[in-house]
């Protein structure tokens, strides 16, 4: 009678357990063969490694050929969850050692097919595709599925050991604490993928932003006029093409000086973050590039008065916001010529100053001195010696000038070579780190020559020369598609020294991808 009661009790326990589970399990036996693993058997039988170990009282993953394993196939209750991370990698197996199949965007709905003991879940997504993800990155978790699996497997062992009913009750409550883990993941921030701009935070990279917003690295660099992948904390990055269009300053400058393309192609690409630059041209460009997208369209009517400038005039009165490069572009001349016409020793201007913008630059004092000394020699000698000595002096003067220019270029290149191997930093002015135009400005300054701070402004302030005319010490410019964005110091034989992502180094201007971006050469 006692045995009958025990049997009834066991049966009742099984019935209660089966009722609590979402589905009914069926048991089978598998014989381990050479090369088999618990994970492989679990996959082929629609169960989990944890379930196999519990059903067979295994304390490790080790199995041997010929070993018989009790397998319980469980049709789990499928649970719908959503990806709580920004992007979640789907792998071919339950662990980071397995290959990535794809990545799911935050908020994507998935169905959990099974839960592994290591916290990974087998999921289905899309149209019947399956894979494995880390369960802590799934929100809205329902824990009934793993409870059902454990209960049903104990029900299988209960047929041979009624006392196992007590174990079932204990295990039924064991998975419950896993629920808060899923709930915690709900607090993970979900990125607004509809945003058009992103403010850079610590740890951000161009690649991470491209993944986060579904844009390619090339697009992000193009939309933001970046010549390298370097970004800095606090920088506002356009992550949609629409933001790039409204933020670009090109149209605003173009209407202001429609006849000159140089100013149009002078966006501050890498250097517009340098707050220490005092050149007015840099300040003006920075102001344009930091406007909010909603305001960028407003300045369009402002340049309307630009056509009132008489570009045929020989003088110009400096106005607020003017710079030498801007004035030079407006009148189709160069910064160096305006400085020579007005005896300027720096690029600084004052509002109200009247500048000569047309005319002939007077010859240098060196030539005049040479000419005046010739008659003096003639006076002190007879005609024969006079004729002989005069060309001798002229020849010496020209030779000295050539040597001086050569020496100046050699000194400039020697200064550039001192910094080979130094690190690149966006906005770097030296002497420990540089960006491209910071490097050229620093090197030329060491030779007593003042250059504008940005590559675009340097392009506008130099005289155009062909590659066949280029000599060591000239500047070489590059355009990635949005205006002048890079500058280096030409050293001859198709080589330049420049500051780029890999630091200060030599580069072939026609090799390693540089050739297709080469714009031309400029002489200071």
UniProtKB/Swiss-Prot annotation:
Residues 28-71, 196-239, 314-357 form the LysM domain. InterPro entries: LysM_dom, LysM_dom_sf, NLP_P60_dom, Papain-like_cys_pep_sf, Peptidase_C40, SH3-like_bac-type. Keywords: Hydrolase, Protease, Repeat, Signal, Thiol protease. One of its GO terms (biological process) is proteolysis. GO terms for molecular function: cysteine-type peptidase activity. It is an enzyme of class 3 (hydrolase). Residues 78-142 form the SH3b domain. Residues 174-188, 272-299, 362-408 have a biased composition (Low complexity). It holds the Pfam family NLPC_P60. The active site is at 436 (nucleophile), 486 (proton acceptor), 498. Residues 150-188, 272-313, 360-408 are annotated as: Disordered. PANTHER family: MUREIN DD-ENDOPEPTIDASE MEPH-RELATED (PTHR47053:SF1). This is Probable endopeptidase p60. It comes from Listeria welshimeri.
